[in-house]
Regions:
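Phosphate-backbone binding interfaces of nucleic-acid-interacting proteins
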Residues: 1-211, 346, 369, 379-380, ...
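A carboxyl-terminal module marker
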Residues: 2, 27, 445-448, 468, ...
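Glycine/proline-enriched, intrinsically flexible loops and inter-domain linkers
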Residues: 5, 23, 27-28, 40, ...
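Beta-rich nucleic-acid/ligand-interaction surfaces
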Residues: 40-44, 207-209, 497-498, 502, ...
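Conserved mixed alpha/beta core segments that line enzyme active sites in large multi-domain catalysts
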Residues: 49-80, 151, 260, 266-335
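Mobile "lid/hinge" segments at catalytic clefts and subdomain interfaces of large enzymes
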Residues: 118-133, 137-143, 155-164, 168, ...
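Terminal amphipathic helices with adjacent charged low-complexity linkers/tails
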Residues: 187, 191-221, 398-426, 432-433
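Extended, well-folded interaction surfaces typified by the phenylalanyl-tRNA synthetase beta subunit core
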Residues: 419-581, 723, 776-781, 788, ...
Length: 810
């Protein structure tokens, strides 16, 4: 936000340097990010003076050039070659002396140097208005009034104004400071705390007077919730034209291009007082009635920027008897504004619901100075005052007379918000006891009234313009802000309390899992959640569930992704194309769907494995990554999270991603899937090597983890015992089945089961296979006996025979 120092000093008579003021504003929380000089004429016309043309003779070597002698107040006149057709002896003219840097009307700089033109020396330049940056005309030199003395700086002649402009990084909650008056109000409070008492100068509206009632415009508000206050007044016989220099300079200083005196007046009030206004051409209001209502869905409407928009049923509009004129609080319509032919103006000043304005502005991708303020909340009590001030200003600079009473639709006055401030809480939150009189003084400087006083604290009434102060903590923050953060002493002692929660925090769990995966050589990636329509139509089984953006940044980013996998494959492809083909990647991200008319977001964890397990070296040969390597990484995660009874099932037939793979199950709950990406999909991403993936449903995983308590115990000091079995099984029986039956049978001393050999061949019957399995047994409190070991192994063997039809292989 840009704040002009000259403008600021209209409300507060400051004699501080801009840098000092900037420091105070920053201390108050209005961070000054920079201070830039401003000149109403770029370059400030430094080096340009009033000259008197003493002689004007024809150039001997050029028909269109003249040689002049010009007195600029130096010891001797300057010889200047000039090509302007209107230059003549006896004229007072602006002269740019050697070394002067001028800026033309487009802002391009050029330096005046000694030169030789067609054989004749020239020691300066007699200037046209475009060369000085004062206009666009180049028809001839500027001829000045004879009253100006020779040598007078042209900066004085043209009343060049200099200013310093603060660039303030305003936080979104500070709606009260989104104007010069608001900044001045805050600055005054800070100065009072420093012992400097200044009067805050509020612009007067005492000259507001209804001259006649010749222009009648009625108002109808259909939704009091969205429009709690609407004011307006008519001004007739205005003359729309150029604004006076002082007003143009104020607007130019903060980057606003002057339009005409009426529009400039509304912008001046907007940036001066913080109240957005709109000026209608009253003669274009059909039926002389404004109706504030929501739009009919699908209505076409062209805004001031020339863009044709389709309105939504929730868009709040200002309409006349036939058509919409404005998107309330956002932007006017193409035919609603003031033009040079306008003679009668209806001025609007209103309060529109912040949420409604924000939704409409976002829906149509519009951001204006008005919507920026309405979205954050303006001062509802200032609507009428700002309207009257703007009307008086327009009278002064555009002529005309006020031709109606002020219409003020304000059915329910908004009461000041009440907060109780406990002194104990002030001391506790700030960490230091602030004198009670100081607290009261600060509150008074902030216009926060004390409605009641007790030993415990203060009852307060918050002014209407402080829409961000709603709680006791907000008031305490305001006290601290004005008191000064630098005035709070910090104790060398640290007081802290230890807290423990049994709940699993999403971010903490992400960090735990990320640490484990990075320890295994995986790299975390982050991808864009926006995808193309092609991705949705190519891979999504239910494309109607995809979430489409209303205003995409580009056609390639028109949808929210439905599957995180494809975002990761883009990263895999990108790296492979840059000769990094051995990849271990993981990503936490969300999938987005529209289900049953509601938006659904599901968080996933994706792992990707491709290329070689180890790089080639003199001790190793390249070995491709394996399905079991990725499976081991996932199982290690489950173990780290305390999920020990995870099983696998074949993929659903409807799975359209994996060529082969399986599902991870925890009881009846699906935790995720794992597999090899289909060749067709890899081809679409220009990937020519196998890619393994694991897709874990992170939200579901956390739900299961929350039900588990991680228990730490001492490592047993008693020895482990290993026993092996060679089991003959049906082809359909998996190691996971063996694993499940084993731990269901023996939970006490069975610690581990491993598959170390698989055999299928001619020596076995058709449909049979042999598993060689090792079992690790251990007792926590004593050494296992042979009898105990044999009994356990027999129990396991019997369970395998009964549950899986297994037999011992001879």
């Amino acid at each position: 936000m840009k704040i002009s120092y000259n403008w600021l000093k209209q409300y507060l008579k400051l004699d501080l340097a801009a840098e000092e003021t900037g420091v105070i504003l920053t201390d108050l929380g209005l961070e000054v990010e920079g201070i830039e000089p401003f000149e109403s004429v770029k370059g400030g016309l430094k080096g340009v003076v009033v000259g008197l043309v003493l002689e004007c003779e024809k150039h001997p070597n050029a028909d269109k050039l003249k040689i002049t002698k010009v007195d600029v107040g130096q010891e001797a006149p300057l010889q200047i070659v000039c090509g302007a057709p209107n230059v003549a002896k006896g004229q007072k003219v602006p002269v740019a002396t050697i070394g002067t840097v001028l800026y033309d009307h487009e802002g391009k700089p050029f330096e005046i140097k000694k030169g030789k033109i067609r054989g004749e020396e020239s020691y300066g330049m007699i200037c046209a208005e475009d060369e000085l940056g004062l206009g666009e005309s180049h028809e001839g030199i500027m001829v000045l009034d004879d009253k100006y003395a020779v040598g007078t700086p042209c900066a004085e002649v043209f009343q060049v104004e200099t200013d310093e402009v603060f660039e303030i990084g305003l936080t979104p909650n500070r709606a009260d400071a989104m104007s010069h008056y608001g900044v001045a109000r805050d600055l005054r409070a800070g100065l009072i705390q420093k012992g400097v008492s200044l009067e805050l100068i509020t612009p007067s509206v005492t000259k507001f007077h209804v001259d006649n009632r010749s222009v009648k415009v009625d108002i109808e508000v259909t939704n009091k919730k969205l429009v709690p206050r609407y004011t307006g007044v008519a001004i007739s016989n205005v003359r729309v034209g150029e604004s006076p220099a002082w007003l143009q300079n104020r607007l130019k200083a903060i980057g606003i291009t002057p339009k005409n005196n009426v529009v400039d007046a509304t912008n001046y009030v907007l940036h001066g007082l913080g109240q957005p206004l709109h000026a209608f051409d009253a003669d274009h209001i059909v039926g002389r009635k404004l109706i504030v209502k929501t739009a009919e869905a699908g209505t076409a409407f062209t805004t001031l920027d020339g863009v044709k928009r389709t309105l939504d049923a929730e868009d709040l509009m200002i309409c006349d008897a036939e058509k919409p004129l404005c998107i309330a609080g956002v932007l006017g319509g193409q035919d609603s504004g003031v033009t040079h032919s306008t003679r009668n103006v209806f001025l609007e000043s209103a309060y529109f619901d912040p949420v409604s304005v924000r939704k409409t502005a976002k829906r149509h991708s519009i951001s204006t100075d008005a919507s920026y303020r309405f979205e954050r909340g303006i001062n509802i009590e200032d609507c009428k005052y700002a309207l009257m001030y703007a009307a008086v200003l327009i009278e002064n600079i555009a002529g005309g007379v006020i031709s109606s009473d002020v219409i003020d639709f304000y059915p329910k006055k908004k009461d000041d918000f009440q907060v109780f401030l406990a002194f104990e809480n002030v001391d506790k939150l700030i960490g230091q006891k602030i004198p009670r009189d100081t607290i009261k003084s600060i509150l008074h400087s902030l216009d926060i009234k004390v409605s009641s006083l007790t030993e415990r604290g203060l009852g307060l009434l918050i002014p209407s313009y402080r829409v961000d102060v709603q709680r006791e903590a907000d008031v305490i923050e305001e006290i601290l802000r004005i008191y000064g953060y630098n005035n709070i002493s910090f104790s060398e002692k640290i007081n802290a309390s230890m807290s423990h929660s049994s709940k699993y925090d999403d971010l903490n769990m992400q960090n735990v899992v990320a640490a484990q995966l990075t320890g295994q050589g995986y790299y975390e990636i982050m991808t864009n959640s926006l995808v193309s329509e092609k991705e949705i139509t190519s891979y999504e089984a239910a494309p109607e569930e995809a979430v489409k953006l209303l205003n995409p940044l580009s056609s390639d980013l028109g949808y929210m992704r439905t599957n995180l996998l494809f975002s990761g494959l883009e990263v895999v492809s990108y790296n492979i194309n840059r000769k990094r083909s051995d990849l271990r990647l993981f990503e936490f991200g969300k999938n987005y769907r529209l289900s049953g008319g509601k938006y659904d977001e599901q968080k996933h964890l994706l792992l990707y494995l491709t290329g070689n397990q180890l790089p080639q070296s003199w001790t190793t040969t390249p070995r491709p990554v394996s399905f079991f390597e990725l499976k081991g990484s996932v199982e290690a995660l489950f173990e780290r999270l305390g999920l020990k009874e995870v099983t696998t099932l074949p993929l659903e037939p409807t799975d359209n991603v994996a060529a082969e793979g399986f599902r991870w199950m925890y009881g009846e709950t699906l935790l995720g899937t794992m597999g090899v990406v289909k060749h067709k999909i890899l081809k679409d991403f220009d990937i020519k090597q196998e890619v393994l993936y694991a897709d874990l449903h992170w939200d579901t995983l956390l739900e299961q983890v929350r039900g588990h308590k991680v228990v730490y115990k001492e490592i047993s000091k008693y020895p482990e015992v290993r026993r092996d079995l060679a089991l003959l099984l049906d082809d359909k029986v998996s190691f996971a089945d063996l694993y499940r039956v084993a731990f269901a049978t023996e939970k006490s001393i069975l610690k581990q089961i491993n598959l170390f050999d698989v055999y299928q061949g001619d020596k076995l019957a058709a449909g049979k296979k042999s598993y060689a399995v090792s079992f690790i047994l251990q007792e926590e409190n004593k050494t296992l006996t042979d009898k105990q070991i044999d009994k356990t192994m027999q129990k396991l063997q019997t369970a395998f025979e009964q549950s899986l039809g297994a037999t011992l292989r001879e």
